[in-house]
């Protein structure tokens, strides 16, 4: 869901922070549940919440959860990211990382619920394991 700068409220900020905490909890749970299966296949699993910048309504702020799978040599063989929140300036529809005169600040929050994000991540983890079995 897209938000204009005028819609950047304390309620939205709290919603983003709540989403961050819940996604972090889900990430730890999934890592705990799935890392053993990857170790059995001589692979390494990383699930990480990535936050660029500190303040959610700052230009260039982004929040996402990423899954990375490394083979036994340490090479990345799978990668997947789910964006949660992104705040950016736009000038004539073009995203900018800096604030220019006449540009508009807006943000986009994922439309999915925590449960839907958890299911999406589980599906990817299962897919990556299935792909490893086929090789």
Task: Describe the predicted segments one by one.
Residues 112-115, 119, 123-126, 130, ...:
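Well-ordered alpha/beta subsegment
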Residues 26-30, 46-50, 61-64:
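Short amphipathic alpha-helical surface micro-motifs
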Residues 57-119:
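Intrinsically disordered, low-complexity regulatory segments enriched in Ser/Thr/Pro
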Residues 40-56:
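Long, charged, glycine-rich C-terminal linkers/tails
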Residues 5, 9, 54, 64-67:
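Intrinsically disordered, low-complexity regions
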């Amino acid at each position: 869901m897209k938000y204009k700068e005028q819609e950047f409220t304390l309620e939205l900020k709290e919603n983003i922070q709540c989403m961050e905490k819940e996604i972090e909890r889900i990430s730890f749970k999934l890592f705990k549940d799935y890392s053993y299966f990857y170790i059995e296949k001589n692979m390494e699993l990383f699930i990480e919440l990535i936050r660029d910048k500190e303040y959610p309504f700052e230009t260039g702020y982004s929040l996402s959860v990423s899954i990375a799978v490394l083979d036994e040599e340490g090479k990345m063989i799978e990668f997947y990211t789910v964006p949660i929140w992104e705040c950016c300036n736009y000038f004539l529809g073009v995203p900018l990382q800096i604030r220019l005169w006449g540009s508009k600040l807006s943000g986009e929050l994922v439309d999915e619920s925590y449960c839907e994000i958890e299911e999406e991540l589980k599906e990817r983890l299962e897919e990556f394991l299935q792909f490893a079995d086929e090789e």
